[in-house]
Curated annotation (Swiss-Prot):
<dbReference type="InterPro" id="IPR016160">
    <property type="entry name" value="Ald_DH_CS_CYS"/>
</dbReference>
<dbReference type="InterPro" id="IPR047597">
    <property type="entry name" value="RocA_bacillales"/>
</dbReference>
<keyword id="KW-0520">NAD</keyword>
<dbReference type="InterPro" id="IPR016161">
    <property type="entry name" value="Ald_DH/histidinol_DH"/>
</dbReference>
<comment type="pathway">
    <text>Amino-acid degradation; L-proline degradation into L-glutamate; L-glutamate from L-proline: step 2/2.</text>
</comment>
<dbReference type="GO" id="GO:0009898">
    <property type="term" value="C:cytoplasmic side of plasma membrane"/>
</dbReference>
<dbReference type="Pfam" id="PF00171">
    <property type="entry name" value="Aldedh"/>
</dbReference>
<dbReference type="GO" id="GO:0003842">
    <property type="term" value="F:1-pyrroline-5-carboxylate dehydrogenase activity"/>
</dbReference>
<dbReference type="InterPro" id="IPR005932">
    <property type="entry name" value="RocA"/>
</dbReference>
<protein>
    <recommendedName>
        <fullName>1-pyrroline-5-carboxylate dehydrogenase 2</fullName>
        <ecNumber>1.2.1.88</ecNumber>
    </recommendedName>
</protein>
<dbReference type="InterPro" id="IPR015590">
    <property type="entry name" value="Aldehyde_DH_dom"/>
</dbReference>
<dbReference type="GO" id="GO:0006537">
    <property type="term" value="P:glutamate biosynthetic process"/>
</dbReference>
<dbReference type="InterPro" id="IPR029510">
    <property type="entry name" value="Ald_DH_CS_GLU"/>
</dbReference>
<dbReference type="GO" id="GO:0010133">
    <property type="term" value="P:proline catabolic process to glutamate"/>
</dbReference>
<feature type="active site">
    <location>
        <position position="286"/>
    </location>
</feature>
<dbReference type="InterPro" id="IPR016162">
    <property type="entry name" value="Ald_DH_N"/>
</dbReference>
<dbReference type="InterPro" id="IPR050485">
    <property type="entry name" value="Proline_metab_enzyme"/>
</dbReference>
Length: 515
């Protein structure tokens, strides 16, 4: 009997024992760098000549690992493996499938600092961000296991006299999981185990910047007892195999987390029925945001400034939930701006292996160049208050940056930057603040800092985002507590870590029997 779900606690690094344990994990991971990682097809290791070289974004000359790349021919083999495994796996008792997730969670929990250390090295995450990523991965495993047990017998429906009716869920088929680099363990794990616990099989294509963490996770699933062929590990570039995975007639379900442009293109391609395809593909996408922290005139102004800074600069702003817009009532605008600038000047930027560094690097050269180009745009569109500098000589470091007095329709108020940049805009009143908050094509997260109950209720109704927070930052959703997913161009509102999520990976069946 499983205990009720409760989220994995974060590590308190002010405790010397925890700091020492994490430092030891970092040292151990240092000794593991540079190894080769094969593909996994039907439980077999497959090595290719074409490789992905994963590097440390804080120290770009340091190789984290070398991962084999899948070709289209190998992808075909992976589909055959997944299709064959599906015919057996779909009939496995849901509780047995759930137990594999529970065992995988226990393995990661025992090796929590190790996985977090890999995230520090491969994704450039500071200690606390890496620890939260690992904790979230554990949460997805524990939560989805329990959700599957809840759903295993279906839902009650009515029966008439002489008739017995059942309504239950069945798996869909082969799922293609395309996971992001910014939550290289948590989102990758969640979007892999949701399909498998519901009885589907998976082709996992992780982000090319963080494939080593994904390879380590596949090893955990094998150790937990996952049968061969249920998950097939097929890292590769989107150019080489991305479209091929989406277009393949054996693909039944696609789960994607990434940019708006790629997500929209994927959604369009998935609608096409290819020769040999006998089904419509189901698509789950999460595509980012342009998220706003709204500050009312009667807000706690210290809380407001801290919420803006935390939302904007955690993990260098590389979260789809990051608060890249601060919309502030004109009566308190200057005070909140001054407080936020002062807090930002206190933030440390550096090598994330150091325990007290707040911000590490951005993920790669492409991200660095894009963010720096937006900073140049920001200098034309607003008043640079702090930051604005970058250094890619050793790693990809950018200072936390605030622009003030930005027009609500300016590019840096409308376009997702995915970096440590926040734009401040002034609102006439609360209604105007909500109008600005809603004026983007995205609708993922938002926060409102206010003590006005009427305004809280108005924002609940009129602030059009999937995840809305009051009197706190707009990042840091917890599985089972804050089901996560957005409106508009932020995706399909497929609430990850919520009670409806697993049903998206299944199809409902009605059976009516007369007696």
């Amino acid at each position: 009997m499983l205990t009720p779900y409760k989220h994995e606690p974060f590590t308190d690094f002010s405790v010397e024992e925890n700091r020492s344990a994490f430092e030891a994990a970092l040292k151990n991971v240092e000794g593991e760098l540079g190894k080769d990682y094969p593909l996994v097809i039907n439980g077999e290791r497959v090595t290719t000549d074409d490789k992905i070289v994963s590097v440390n974004p804080a120290m770009k000359e340091q190789v984290i690992g070398v991962v084999s790349k899948a070709s289209r021919e190998i992808v075909d083999d992976a589909f055959k493996s997944a299709e064959t495994a599906f015919h057996t796996w779909k009939n496995v008792n849901p509780e047995e499938r759930a137990n594999i997730l529970i065992r995988a969670a226990a393995i990661i929990r025992r090796r929590k600092h190790e996985f977090s250390a890999w995230l520090v090295k491969e994704a450039g995450k500071p200690w606390k961000e890496a620890d939260a990523d690992t904790a979230e991965a554990i949460d997805f495993l524990e939560y989805y296991a329990r959700q599957m047990i809840t759903l295993k017998d279906g839902k009650p429906v009515n029966s008439r006299e002489g008739e017995h009716n059942r309504y239950f869920y069945t798996p869909i088929g082969v799922c293609v999981t395309i996971s992001p680099w910014n939550f290289a363990l948590a989102i990758m794990a969640g979007t892999t185990v949701a399909p498998i616990v519901t009885g589907n099989t998976v082709l996992l294509k992780p982000a090319s910047t963080t494939p080593v963490v994904a390879a380590k996770f596949v090893e955990v699933l094998e150790e937990a007892g996952l049968p061969k062929g249920v998950v097939n590990f097929v890292p590769g570039s989107g150019t080489d195999i991305g479209d091929y995975l989406i277009d393949h007639p054996k693909t039944s379900l696609i789960t994607f987390t990434g940019s708006r442009d790629v997500g929209v293109r994927l959604y369009e391609r998935a609608a096409v029925v290819h020769p040999g395809q006998q089904h419509l593909k189901r698509v789950i996408v999460e595509m980012g945001g342009k998220d706003t922290v709204v500050v009312d005139k009667d807000a706690d102004l210290d809380l407001a400034a801290q919420s803006i800074v935390t939302s904007a600069f955690g993990f260098s702003g590389q979260k789809c939930s990051a608060g890249s817009r601060a919309v502030i009532h004109q009566d308190v605008y200057d005070v909140v701006l001054e407080k936020a600038v002062a807090l930002t000047k206190q933030l440390s930027v550096g090598e994330p292996t150091a325990p007290d560094v707040y911000m590490g690097p951005v993920v790669d050269q492409g991200a660095f160049s894009k963010i720096m180009s937006y900073i140049e745009v920001g200098k034309e569109e607003g008043r640079l208050m702090v930051g604005g500098e970058g250094d890619d000589s050793k790693g990809f470091f950018i200072q936390p940056t605030i622009f003030a007095d930005v027009d609500p329709h300016a590019r840096i108020m409308q376009e997702e930057i995915f970096g440590p940049v926040v734009a401040f805009s002034k609102a006439r009143d609360f209604d105007h603040a909500l109008e600005i908050a809603n004026n983007t094509e995205y609708g993922l997260t938002g926060a409102v800092i206010t003590t006005n109950r009427h305004h809280i209720e108005k924002a609940k109704r009129d602030f059009h985002v999937g995840n809305l927070y009051f009197n706190r930052n707009c990042t840091g959703a917890i599985v089972g507590y804050h089901p996560f997913g957005g409106f508009k161009m932020s995706g399909t509102d497929s609430k990850a870590g919520g009670p409806d999520y697993l049903a998206l990976h299944m199809q409902a069946k009605t059976v009516s029997e007369m007696y």
